[in-house]
Structures are given as C-alpha cells and as structure tokens.
Amino acid sequence: MIRPWEANPSAEFRRRLGKSAGELGTTNSSPSCPDIWELDNGDFAVVGRDLTAAYAGRLPDDVSVAPDERIVVIPRTTLVAARSDIPHA
C-alpha cells in the first residue's frame, strides 16, 4: 500500500526545537536525552522512550501503529519548551 507520507532517511538535522535535555533537567548526562529536532526537509524527529508495547493494548479506536512506527513518549517540559520554535503552517 502506498502511503501519502514517508519518512526520508536521508534528511539531516537542521535545528533543535526548544531547549536541550540538559537545560530542562531531563537527563543526568547519560545517553538518554529526550529531544525534538526539525529536519532539513521540514519533518520533525523526536527522541524519547519507545512505549509502543506498553500502549499497544489500549490505543484509542482511531489510532493504529504500523509495523515500522513507534509510540514515542517525551516529557511535557520538552514539548512545552519547543512550542515557540514550532513553525506556523
């Protein structure tokens, strides 16, 4: 099945949205850093915890996760800090 959108694996990281995990206090300098990045093609990359298995049995009726997709959870502070950097339409 052809999907109307596909992730482009050759897109490069352009800029961080919001503050770094260190600035927000959501990391202890380990490699576990939640983050949101705009890619050079306009898409966004989210670094967070993969909770696909934990949520699989309790998705809302109109939500589905394809085999190549994951449910990624980030701290609220990460998204709130990015709000002013998210481009408008």
What are these regions (language model features)?
Residues 18, 47-48:
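Glycine-centered structural positions embedded in regular secondary structure
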Residues 1-31:
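Short, charged/polar N-terminal "headpieces" of proteins
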Residues 48, 55-89:
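Helix-rich interaction surfaces within compact, conserved domain-sized segments
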Residues 39-42:
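Short acidic-glycine loop/turn motifs at beta-strand connectors
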Residues 32, 46:
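Short, surface-exposed polybasic-aromatic patches that bind anionic ligands, especially phosphate groups
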Residues 26-29, 53-57:
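Short amphipathic alpha-helical surface micro-motifs
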Residues 44, 52:
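Surface-exposed, flexible loop/turn segments at secondary-structure boundaries
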Residues 35:
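Short, surface-exposed charged micro-motifs
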